[in-house]
């Protein structure tokens, strides 16, 4: 009996769950219920209300957060638009200020600020060429967008016939962009011009050390004038009145560039006139022009006849002197004396006795030597050639005597000339000094 009571007590109190609301049932051994069912239902309804309130609260919080985020995003967008507008305005004002300053000061360090604004907008750095290409493409896209906006604004204005403020802003912005670009191009062109002017070396007429060749000293003033800077400029211009002196061994096609090409190499030129005594060893003697007389007029004609018929020279001379009644020996002595007293250097001058000058006289001294002579004649006119003085070979025993300078004594004039090669006599009465020299030249030419 006691065991039965104990089991009933243990099972009398248990927990029963109904729709999430715990219901406690009490029973005793007699079977009485501990709690009414109405209290359980009230508790269940209260719990349901509380749960619904919690759900409403969570949804309200979520809606509030969503509205706040949307509001924040809208405000952020508006602030960003305002910042971009202010930045564009600042860039435009700065560009205008720089344009004014550059026009006043002509400064070359101008950098357009449009690139800086684009860099700040797109977060680009111009450290690499790829970044520069990127920035250029972005600027092209922006310019295209601006053009499209301007065109669309124009179409809308045409449709509505109402001037829009937005169109004016776009036009002004495009205008200032073009102005900045043109200004940048002008500054870049000026900088390139200055750089090219520094690189380009002007052509300065450099006086190259050159001297006139020794064999071309007949007209030294004319030849030396070719090497002056003005003459060089005339030659380079292609003037036909001046002919350039070219080095030997060059063709006609290289005459224009031969003188300039020599300045590029290390060429040793002959010494200048002011650097060496070599070119001034012999003073230049002015040539004395004889007056035009009947004797000088017939001189060339007689020389041609003497060259053609040298054997008839003595006969012609004797015949002419016999016609006039003059002794040939006395006339020769008088001619030599008169020549020595008047002009010893001019040995070819014809000196005839006083008398009738209308008669045809013959010059007994030839004008010039034959062209086949290997050495210049000693009685040639005094043409000074600049160069080292070389002693002439003298075929006489006495080396101190010179044939060029005649002696004043009559004994030396009457002394016959003797050839040292063939021992042939040349008396002064029938032969002249030119005949003796021509005879010596035949020995050098190998004729005898």
From Swiss-Prot:
Location in or out of the cell: Cytoplasm
Record keywords, A-Z: Coiled coil, Cytoplasm, DNA damage, Metal-binding, Phosphoprotein, Zinc, Zinc-finger
Molecular function, one GO term: deubiquitinase activator activity
One GO cellular component term noted in the UniProt record for this chain: cytosol
GO biological process: cellular response to interleukin-1; cellular response to ionizing radiation; cellular response to tumor necrosis factor; DNA damage response; negative regulation of canonical NF-kappaB signal transduction; negative regulation of tumor necrosis factor-mediated signaling pathway; positive regulation of protein deubiquitination; positive regulation of type I interferon production
UniProt cross-references to Pfam families, sorted A to Z: TBD
Region called TRAF family member interaction, residue ranges: 205-224
Expression sites by tissue: Heart, brain, spleen, lung, liver, skeletal muscle, kidney and testis.
Modified residues (Phosphothreonine): 246
Region ranges (Necessary for interaction with ZC3H12A): 35-65
Binding locations of Zn(2+): 419, 422, 439, 443
InterPro entries attached to this UniProt entry: CALCOCO1/2_Zn_UBZ1, TANK, TBD
Region (Necessary for interaction with TRAF6): 105-224
Phosphoserine sites (modified residues): 211, 258, 261, 377, 380
Zinc finger (UBZ1-type): 416-443
Coiled-coil portions: 60-98
Region (Interaction with TBK1 and IKBKE): 166-205
Functional note: Adapter protein involved in I-kappa-B-kinase (IKK) regulation which constitutively binds TBK1 and IKBKE playing a role in antiviral innate immunity. Acts as a regulator of TRAF function by maintaining them in a latent state. Blocks TRAF2 binding to LMP1 and inhibits LMP1-mediated NF-kappa-B activation. Negatively regulates NF-kappaB signaling and cell survival upon DNA damage.
Assembly behavior: Homodimer. Found in a deubiquitination complex with TANK, USP10 and ZC3H12A; this complex inhibits genotoxic stress- or interleukin-1-beta-mediated NF-kappaB activation by promoting IKBKG or TRAF6 deubiquitination. Interacts with IKBKG; this interaction increases in response to DNA damage. Interacts with TRAF6; this interaction increases in response to DNA damage and recruits USP10 to the ubiquitinated TRAF6. Interacts with USP10; this interaction increases in response to DNA damage. Interacts with TBK1 and IKBKE.
Name this protein carries in UniProt: TRAF family member-associated NF-kappa-B activator
Annotated source species: Mus musculus (Mouse)
Gene that specifies this protein: Tank
């Amino acid at each position: 009996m006691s065991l039965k009571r104990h089991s009933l007590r243990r099972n009398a109190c248990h927990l029963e769950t109904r729709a999430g609301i715990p219901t406690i049932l009490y029973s005793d051994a007699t079977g009485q219920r501990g709690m009414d069912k109405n209290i359980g239902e009230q508790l269940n309804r209260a719990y349901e209300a509380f749960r619904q309130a919690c759900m409403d609260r969570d949804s309200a919080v979520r809606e509030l957060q969503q509205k706040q985020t949307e509001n924040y995003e809208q405000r952020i967008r508006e602030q960003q638009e305002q910042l971009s507008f202010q930045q564009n305005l600042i860039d435009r004002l700065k560009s205008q200020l720089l344009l004014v300053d550059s026009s006043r000061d002509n400064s070359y360090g101008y950098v357009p600020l449009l690139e800086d604004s684009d860099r700040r907008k797109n977060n680009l750095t111009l450290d690499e060429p790829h970044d520069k290409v990127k920035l250029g493409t972005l600027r092209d896209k922006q310019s295209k967008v601006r053009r499209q906006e301007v065109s669309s604004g124009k179409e809308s204005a045409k449709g509505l016939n109402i001037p829009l403020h937005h169109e004016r802003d776009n036009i002004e912005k495009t205008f200032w962009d073009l102005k900045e670009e043109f200004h940048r191009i002008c500054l870049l062109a000026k900088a390139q011009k200055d750089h090219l002017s520094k690189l380009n070396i002007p052509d300065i007429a450099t006086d190259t050390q050159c001297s006139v060749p020794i064999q071309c000293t007949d007209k030294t003033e004319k030849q030396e004038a070719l090497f002056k800077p003005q003459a060089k400029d005339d030659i380079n211009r292609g003037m036909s009145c001046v002919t350039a002196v070219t080095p030997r061994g060059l063709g006609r096609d290289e005459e224009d560039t031969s003188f300039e090409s020599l300045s590029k190499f290390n060429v040793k030129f002959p010494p200048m006139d002011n650097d060496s005594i070599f070119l001034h060893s012999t003073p230049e003697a002015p040539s004395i022009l004889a007056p035009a007389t009947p004797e000088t007029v017939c001189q060339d004609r007689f020389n041609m006849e003497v060259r053609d018929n040298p054997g008839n020279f003595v006969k012609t001379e004797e015949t002419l002197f016999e016609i006039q009644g003059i002794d040939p020996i006395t006339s020769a002595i008088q001619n030599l004396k008169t020549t020595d007293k008047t002009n010893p250097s001019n040995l070819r001058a014809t000196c005839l006795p006083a008398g009738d000058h209308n008669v045809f006289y013959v010059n007994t001294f030839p004008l010039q030597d034959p062209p086949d002579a290997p050495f210049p004649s000693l009685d040639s006119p005094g043409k000074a050639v600049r160069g080292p003085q070389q002693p002439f070979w003298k075929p006489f025993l006495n080396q101190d005597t010179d044939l060029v300078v005649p002696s004043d004594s009559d004994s030396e004039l009457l002394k016959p000339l003797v050839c040292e090669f063939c021992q042939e006599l040349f008396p002064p009465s029938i032969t002249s000094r030119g005949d003796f020299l021509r005879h010596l030249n035949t020995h050098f030419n190998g004729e005898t």
